[in-house]
Each structure stands twice: as C-alpha cells, then as structure tokens.
C-alpha cells in the first residue's frame, strides 16, 4: 500500500518500475509485489507529471546491533535530552522485527522516562528497562551539571553507549 496525496504513484523495486497507479480521493494505491530484498521506492506525481515526493524502504542486513542516537548533538545543563534507541544493521537501517528488553543506565544525568510507542505498553515509563516496539524505544534524560552525559543501553546480547556534551 502506498499513501499519497497525488495524481499518481510509481513503485520501484531495485531500480525497475513494478507498478503505476492513479490515485483517487482516498489517497491509496495498492500493489502486489513478490518479496525481493533490496530497495522499494514509491514516487508520487501531480497531474502534470511533476514529482511531488518519494519514500524508500531498504532491506536491513543480517547483523544486528543497538544504536543510540540523541535528538541533538549537545544539551544544556538541566534540560532534557531525547535519545532514540533502535535495533539496526551495520548501516543503521532499522530492524523493525527485532525485539528485546533494553536496560538503560545514565552517567552525568538522570533518566526521567523510558518507553516505546506501543499503545498497550505495560511497563512503567519510569523504569530503567523498556521493550522495543517495531525495533525502537526512546530514553529521556535530564542533563546534569557536568561536561557530558553518557547513556549505556544493553539487552543482554547487544550493547551501546552514547555521550552527549552538556553546555551551560
């Protein structure tokens, strides 16, 4: 399924067109495409044939790791730092089917929230462990007064750490 507010959509699989559809008022085009690893790209066009946008999905590799990415490269002392935790491959492509309970530890700050976007998430957001939802979770850390904060994430199989400079 491709959702777009456009006149038509093309679907590309690994560099070749596998379908074209005109869209109606529901902004939905359905395609049936056999699975093939690689790159699936939807390109939307207006009535004059000008490109409006594109969206790409890429198959993740075999290797799995936890990636921790702060929303901003620095944080002010006392302010909140949002750190996205994801299961990814070696190229940083999210692996939405990977799932685990990630334990978070913070040095140089305070963990104020940890969770995911799952609508039936049963754990407390104040806990230091969160299950991933479609391969992702989010940690919210209040920066301390030191020069940096470090978040370590570990699920018992994979681990990562990220350090964020703290400014005053």
Predicted regions and their residues:
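Short proline/glycine-enriched turn/loop motifs at strand-loop junctions of beta-rich domains
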Residues: 2-8, 97, 146
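Short beta-strand segments within Ig-like beta-sandwich modules, predominantly Fibronectin type-III
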Residues: 19-25
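Extracellular Ig-like/FN3 beta-sandwich strand-entry sites
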Residues: 35-39, 78-80, 146-148
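Short, hydrophobic beta-strand segments
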Residues: 30-35, 126-145
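Short aromatic-acidic-glycine turn motif
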Residues: 63-65, 105-121
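Beta-strand-rich structural segments
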Residues: 2-3, 43-44, 78-96, 102, ...
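Beta-strand signatures of extracellular beta-sandwich domains
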Residues: 8-12, 43, 101-105
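Edge beta-strands of extracellular beta-sandwich domains
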Residues: 49-61, 158-167
């Amino acid at each position: 399924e491709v959702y777009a507010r456009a006149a038509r959509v093309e679907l590309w699989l690994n560099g070749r067109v596998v379908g074209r559809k005109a869209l109606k008022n529901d902004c939905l085009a359905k395609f049936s495409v056999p699975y093939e690893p690689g790159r699936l790209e939807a390109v939307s066009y207006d009535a004059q044939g000008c490109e409006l946008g594109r969206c790409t999905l890429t198959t993740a590799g075999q290797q799995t790791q936890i990636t921790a990415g702060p929303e901003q490269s620095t944080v002010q002392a006392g302010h909140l730092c949002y750190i996205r935790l994801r299961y990814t491959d070696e190229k940083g492509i999210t692996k939405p089917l990977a799932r685990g309970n990630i334990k978070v530890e913070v040095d140089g700050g305070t963990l104020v929230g940890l969770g995911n976007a799952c609508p039936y998430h049963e754990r407390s957001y104040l806990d230091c462990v969160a299950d991933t939802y479609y391969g992702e979770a989010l940690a919210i850390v209040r920066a301390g007064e030191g020069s940096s904060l470090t978040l370590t994430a570990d699920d018992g199989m994979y681990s990562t750490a990220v350090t964020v400079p703290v400014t005053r």
